[in-house]
Amino acid sequence: MNSSQVLSDPSQATLTPVARRVQFIEHLGKKVLFINYADCGATMMKAVAGEGHRLLSLEPPNSVLTLNDVTGATFDHEAVAFLKSMVAANAPFVRRGAVVGINGLQSLIYEAVQAFSRRKLPQFTSREQALQWLVQD
């Protein structure tokens, strides 16, 4: 993420592995919640999704830009069900969301999550492309 920076305090080292995966970053002067599911197994995916929802729910409605990276993530049935419910629960807080890293069978899960949540989350081939789209007015 070339022109992006993490918006966090120096206590980064004290963050849990889950909290390190869900952080606000800044891209071209705009705040984006980066939810990093990359290489997560099903258990970690659920924990990351829960942390993402916790942070989103602290923000005003329809205010948050989100970037979700699912590169190399693996899912089980329970994780998919949980992810569907979290994406739906996050909807009131998200102004715009994007996804990167969708490959192979992940496309089926991506379509199922969108259908269940009734949200359209465009997918991009790179984080940079997604960030550019998110911050455009």
Please describe what each predicted stretch is:
Residues 2-137:
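Amphipathic, Lys/Arg-enriched alpha-helical "gate/interface" segment within cytosolic domains
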